[in-house]
Amino acid sequence: MQTPTPQQLMQQFAQKVARTRAYRYTWEFQERDEKTGKLSAKQIYTLEFLQPHYRKMTIVQRDAFSNGAVLIHNPDLDTKVHARKGFIRRVYERNDPEVARFFETDLGYILKELQRLFRGAKAEPVKSVQQGQRNGYQLVFAPPKDPVQRVSLTLERADLMPLRIEYADAKGTRSLRVYTEYAFPNLTKDDFTI
């Protein structure tokens, strides 16, 4: 299989996102602390997503209070985000800063952000790379006129799911997501009950 051009890879990823009905993935997330300039401790999340808008996220590792919490959004039942951890239950408005990033975790959101940054960007040729035990395509590009100065996107070669996404600026890495597991389960609306 021939290595795609940067434009072809972005187009193939967009097609993958459009045709993927349901998925589950786990990722490790770190972002730079602006006070120290260092990457934060690793956070781990699992997302289950069913088109067009059902989502459930489990906080695997973040802090003692949040670990094990599950956030669910099912707009057929309610416009709010429901969180539970054991017997504790909370309800958040969709625009509450506490849960704002919850809506930035699905492939559709990630694709839109990557497309925005890719428009007019200077891209390096796509490379074949290893990410852990998986074969991937790595696309590195420099967005024009944006605080993000460099994006490194690695997609799994066989099914084009993300393996790694790194955003950097003049100070270095701003945020890093490493996707450790993914699957395509047969999810239904019933999997997103509140």
Enumerate the predicted regions with their spans:
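Short, solvent-exposed helix-to-loop capping segments enriched in aromatics
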Residues: V17, F103-F118
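Short, solvent-exposed coil/turn segments at beta-strand boundaries
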Residues: R19-A22, L47-K56, I72-T79, R134, ...
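N-terminal leader/targeting segments and the immediate start of mature chains
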Residues: M1-Y54, A123-V129, D190-I194
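Short hydrophobic/aromatic-rich beta-strand segments that constitute the beta-sheet cores
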Residues: Y25-W27, Y54-I59, D78-R84, F141, ...
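Extracytoplasmic/secreted envelope proteins and their assembly/folding machinery
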Residues: Q7-M10, A14, G108-L111, S152
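Gly/Pro-enriched, hydrophobic low-complexity segments
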Residues: Q30-R32, D63-A64, K122-I194
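A short, amphipathic edge element
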Residues: Q7-Q8, L111-K127, R177
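An acidic-aromatic
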Residues: T46-D106, T173-L176
